[in-house]
Amino acid sequence: MSAKVREDLVLSHAVVTAEVEAPFDHVDIAQWLKTLPTHEYQRCAPPDHKAAGYTVDDDGTPMSINVEMIGTGLVVQQYRFEVAEPQYCKMVSLSDVLTPLGWTSTQVIWELLMEQLDGDQCRYTNTVTSHPTEDFLEFISKNGQTFPEAAEARQEASGRHCRLETPLYAQSIARWAAPPTPQRQPRNCPLGPRRPGRRSTPSPYGLDLPT
């Protein structure tokens, strides 16, 4: 088995766009990714998205870990931040895939781009490209499937998934970039005064986070 990536073969390629209102100068996709709560990630593609987290690779490169269903496969995406800019990120993962027939692997390249159209009117582009590994090619051959057949199935599944997540990602990035809404203080608190050192900060996702 080999995890060598076959960049000469394309397993799937999906490009989906969504327009959204967002303060363009405050958009920071890299920071949004690094601070994305797992439940917000789930809201961006229900029920496909399962969990998300942030870590670093051995060399210190930031990584985003995403667990999601693509078609019938449970995919563990281990994205390295290859490009991390406010309006553009390129994430590259050697991903583990659990299929009904067992485990295999693919490379996934995820590109996130926000462009300003006019004022706060923006366009978000979600691009996902997948290449097979040698392991993947051996896996499908062993199970009686040709590469064109596997690519057709993956293209359909990836396209459907991207169409689901793209507008929801755009809205989530826009909420993160929006200025915080001032909180109204209650006149009377039936539970008594707050404990010292405990306060709430507004979350861009509509939740009050204790700090």
What would you call each of these model-derived segments?
Residues 146-192:
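Long, compositionally biased interface segments
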